[in-house]
């Protein structure tokens, strides 16, 4: 399940944080991709895909247009969220309850996304009387494997949660397939094909599911995923509520499926996706969690609320981060060869980058508390550092079942949440 199932999480009004790359075992395949350079003389063995050329000036203009559109999208989403927040504020105030805005951020992590799926199932079991019970989220975002989880978490009903868990408990052998004996040839668009992943997205994110998503987001709630635009070298976050409505209106589900596949597409390993005539790959290249790292403080949700409603107190904001990985890799004696060195370096850097992003989110919350007198809470959960896969390999049922069980146990225990940033 590719980067989409890569060990790497989500919100559009938040710009992406640092990159957490592909899963530990899938990273080993990256070395095979590098070998392709050794076979450049074989490129004539098959036709290469071609794309219309663009000059530098055209690309710079395209980037400027994209930046403008992204800014406009962010403003619209912020506006929707503020309206949604005000409606929630009024409802809770009428009931004599303090208003709370809940934001779920789901990371990537490959097959280790089974942990997040299980965690949500366990969390769903927590009594509603518990102050840390699973809420209805005002915003849900995901990257890579988090992209698969996010729609189900957004809907939040038991049927959706069970459907998500069932998917992670039953990995298909065709989720990832090598292209054959000459899979490494540079003319191939990727080392592997993902027919199983494509099938799962078609089957689970069908028109009925899209109608549910559009209905759930009609009041301004947000569901968003991150992708990486390789042509422009930058992130692009897609609002899946808007995309779901577009699919319903047009009857065309291919676009939203391509967006999800792009968010899940490990560069070079899985096929890239062409969206709006541009090349897109794994969102984790530009942000394993999307949390607002590039947004100015005056554009943050607490600041926007103060501008819109200066005479009302800022509602409480709660950020819930599910990291489908361990913040620190398990210690090992690395083999003395370049393949092992590359694998271990990428693995270590991706986790360190995500830890830095989480620390940044905690720092941003502290700034809102100090500058805006806002009540902002951040909680994070991750796979325990002492956990180890029961069997080697990627997308193995025994490992994914183990992670679902672990996640479910931890999710049912609200003490699993940490309100402190990673300290190492």
Regions found by a protein language model. Name each.
Residues 13-14, 30-31, 398, 406:
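A periodicity- and composition-biased signal for non-globular, repetitive helical segments
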Residues 19, 26-30, 59-62:
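Extended hydrophobic/Leu-rich segments
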Residues 45-138, 154-424:
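Patatin-like phospholipase
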Residues 149-152:
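Hydrolases whose catalytic domains are alpha/beta-hydrolase-1, hotdog thioesterase
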């Amino acid at each position: 399940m590719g980067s989409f199932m890569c060990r790497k999480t989500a919100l559009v009004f938040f710009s992406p944080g640092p990159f957490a790359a592909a899963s530990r075992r899938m990273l080993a395949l990256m070395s095979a991709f590098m070998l392709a350079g050794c076979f450049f003389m074989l490129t004539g063995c098959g036709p290469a895909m071609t794309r219309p050329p663009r000059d530098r000036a055209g690309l710079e203009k395209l980037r400027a247009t994209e930046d403008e559109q992204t800014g406009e999208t962010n403003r619209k989403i912020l506006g929707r969220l503020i309206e949604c927040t005000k409606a929630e504020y009024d409802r809770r105030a009428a009931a004599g309850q303090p208003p709370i805005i809940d934001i779920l951020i789901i990371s990537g992590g490959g097959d280790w996304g089974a942990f997040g799926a299980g965690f949500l199932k366990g969390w769903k079991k927590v009594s509603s009387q518990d102050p840390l019970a699973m809420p209805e989220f005002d915003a849900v975002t995901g990257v890579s494997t988090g992209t698969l989880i996010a729609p189900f978490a957004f809907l939040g009903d038991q049927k959706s949660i069970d459907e998500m868990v069932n998917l992670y408990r039953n990995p298909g052998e065709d989720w990832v397939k090598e292209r054959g004996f000459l899979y490494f040839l540079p003319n191939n668009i990727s080392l592997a094909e993902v027919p199983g992943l494509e099938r799962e997205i078609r089957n689970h994110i069908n028109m009925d599911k899209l109608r549910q998503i559009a209905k759930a987001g009609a009041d301004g709630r947000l569901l968003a995923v991150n992708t990486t635009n390789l042509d422009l070298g930058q992130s692009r976050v897609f609002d899946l509520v808007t995309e779901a409505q577009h699919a319903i209106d047009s009857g065309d589900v291919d676009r939203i499926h391509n967006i999800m596949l792009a968010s899940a597409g490990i560069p070079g390993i899985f096929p890239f996706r062409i969206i709006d005539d541009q090349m897109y790959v794994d969102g984790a290249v530009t942000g394993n969690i999307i949390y607002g790292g590039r947004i100015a403080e005056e554009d943050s949700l607490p600041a926007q609320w103060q501008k819109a409603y200066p005479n009302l107190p800022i509602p409480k904001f709660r950020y819930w981060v599910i990291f489908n990985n361990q913040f620190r890799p398990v210690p090992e004696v690395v083999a003395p060869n370049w393949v092992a060195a590359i694998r271990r370096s990428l693995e270590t850097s991706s986790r360190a980058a995500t830890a830095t992003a989480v620390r940044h989110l905690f720092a941003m919350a502290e700034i809102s508390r100090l500058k805006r007198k806002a009540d902002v809470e951040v909680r994070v959960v991750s796979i325990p550092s002492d956990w180890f896969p029961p069997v080697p390999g990627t997308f193995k049922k025994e490992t994914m079942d183990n992670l679902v069980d672990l996640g479910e146990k931890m999710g049912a225990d609200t003490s699993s949440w940490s309100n402190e940033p990673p300290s190492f």
